[in-house]
């Protein structure tokens, strides 16, 4: 059974693959500072201001950060302080999409009416294991 650290590392890798490795560094820096301006965040992470802003706008759309206008500066405030929850929030739309993709496609045996998932159909080489009939996609 995977440890908590292994689970977080896996989620972190997935976020990095989807959003880029800069997202992880921006999140970690936000966790340390709670409220920070874009320029300081750019210096702390070593990424350009545009790269940092892209990450921040994505985090804002997901409800993880909000911006505060204070005098001439835009400050960014982290709304969620649990690293794993932040990763889960970022991965949620992709997990839903993944479930929808795998959940929609079924294969049916026209002879006996049994239904098979894509994985099962591939395993049986798209033939019904009961009667050998070629399976038909049902969408």
UniProtKB/Swiss-Prot annotation:
The molecular function GO annotations come to: DNA binding
One Pfam family assigned to this protein is TFIIE_alpha
Q: Which domain of life is it from?
A: Archaea
The GO biological-process annotations, alphabetized, read as:
regulation of DNA-templated transcription; transcription initiation at RNA polymerase II promoter
Which SMART domains does this chain map to?
TFIIE (SM00531)
InterPro entries assigned to the protein according to its UniProt record, in alphabetical order:
TF_E_archaea, TFIIE/TFIIEa_HTH, TFIIE_asu, TFIIEa/SarR/Rpc3_HTH_dom, WH-like_DNA-bd_sf, WH_DNA-bd_sf
Q: Please list the residue ranges annotated as the HTH TFE/IIEalpha-type domain.
A: 7-91
Q: Which UniProt keywords apply?
A: DNA-binding, Transcription, Transcription regulation
How it assembles, according to the record, is: Monomer. Interaction with RNA polymerase subunits RpoF and RpoE is necessary for Tfe stimulatory transcription activity. Able to interact with Tbp and RNA polymerase in the absence of DNA promoter. Interacts both with the preinitiation and elongation complexes.
Per the record, the domain comment is: The winged helix domain is involved in binding to DNA in the preinitiation complex.
Q: What's its job?
A: Transcription factor that plays a role in the activation of archaeal genes transcribed by RNA polymerase. Facilitates transcription initiation by enhancing TATA-box recognition by TATA-box-binding protein (Tbp), and transcription factor B (Tfb) and RNA polymerase recruitment. Not absolutely required for transcription in vitro, but particularly important in cases where Tbp or Tfb function is not optimal. It dynamically alters the nucleic acid-binding properties of RNA polymerases by stabilizing the initiation complex and destabilizing elongation complexes.
Family label = Belongs to the TFE family.
Protein name per its UniProtKB record: Transcription factor E
**What gene is this protein translated from?**
tfe
């Amino acid at each position: 059974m995977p440890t908590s650290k292994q689970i977080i590392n896996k989620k972190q890798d997935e976020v990095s693959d989807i959003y880029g490795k800069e997202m992880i560094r921006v999140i970690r820096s936000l966790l340390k500072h709670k409220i920070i301006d874009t320029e300081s965040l750019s210096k702390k992470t070593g990424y350009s201001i545009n790269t940092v802003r892209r990450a921040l706008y994505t985090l804002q759309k997901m409800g993880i950060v909000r911006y505060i206008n204070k005098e001439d500066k835009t400050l960014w405030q982290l709304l969620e302080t649990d690293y794993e929850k932040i990763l889960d929030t970022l991965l949620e739309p992709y997990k839903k999409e993944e479930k929808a993709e795998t959940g929609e496609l079924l294969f049916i045996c026209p002879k006996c009416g049994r239904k098979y998932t894509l994985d099962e159909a591939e395993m049986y080489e798209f033939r019904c294991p009961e009667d050998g009939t070629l399976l038909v996609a049902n969408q």
